[in-house]
Amino acid sequence: MKNPILTLFVLLLYTQINAQEAKYADVNGMKIYYEIHGEGEPLVLLHGFTMSHTMWEGWIEDFSKSYKLIIPDLREHGNSTNPSNEFTHEESAKDIYGLLDLLKIDKFKAIGFSSGGMTLTHMATMDTSRIQAMVLISSTSFFPESCREILRSVNYESVDENWMNNMKKQHPGGEKQIRSLLTQFNNMAYSYDDMNFTNPYLSTIKSPTLIIHGDRDVFFPVDIPVNSYKSIPTSYLWIVPNFGHSSIDKNSIWADAFLIVVNKFFSGEWQ
């Protein structure tokens, strides 16, 4: 016979862990979807291109124990809109600052994967005082030609099955939304001003920065994060062996190490 008290406790615990606030914010002529989980000092989590807020689902329970998580969908991704059908990381940075201003959040910590990290790099140079510490995963300061070749080559028909299935799960607008995102993905190959951070420009970043990068990243070779590490004054570098252009999810062999390293970094133990 089931113990009703134990069952109730489990249900209450599950409800508390999964409690969230999901809303839309009017920012720069768009509806930006965001979720809030937990309480404490703010921690912003930014996903990669063609992904959505759902990429962070596996980490919500861990990070919401210590932080108030703000997890948005970048413009046109997931549930967010984008009437202009244009995407740059600089504009994305303005969107996120607009959202945080509406939420009356001044200082915050942040983690960004790929385009999320590029968005954070713009944010950290736009306003050097607001980001208390940031983690850049599989991010870059510029697009090398090898990356541009990949950006040019991708289209709706050529995307592999796993990638397509993930996009369909994360984007309620279906084929139309996905095609628009992939068009913007292609357009990045021809942009030379959005992601073009010189070493002197990177040196203006005042936020303590942890750079996490795989040594087998096909988009951004390892010399790029090494250069960023040398250029950003208070920075730390973790090169993950046998790891490609990917986030570290809960099923990764690096999941435990990731949680320990990020928590130590955010606690200020390394500074």
PLM-predicted stretches and their roles:
Residues 49, 108, 112-114, 214:
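Conserved alpha/beta-hydrolase "nucleophile elbow" surrounding the catalytic nucleophile
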Residues 118-126, 132-164:
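Flexible "cap/lid" loop of the alpha/beta hydrolase fold
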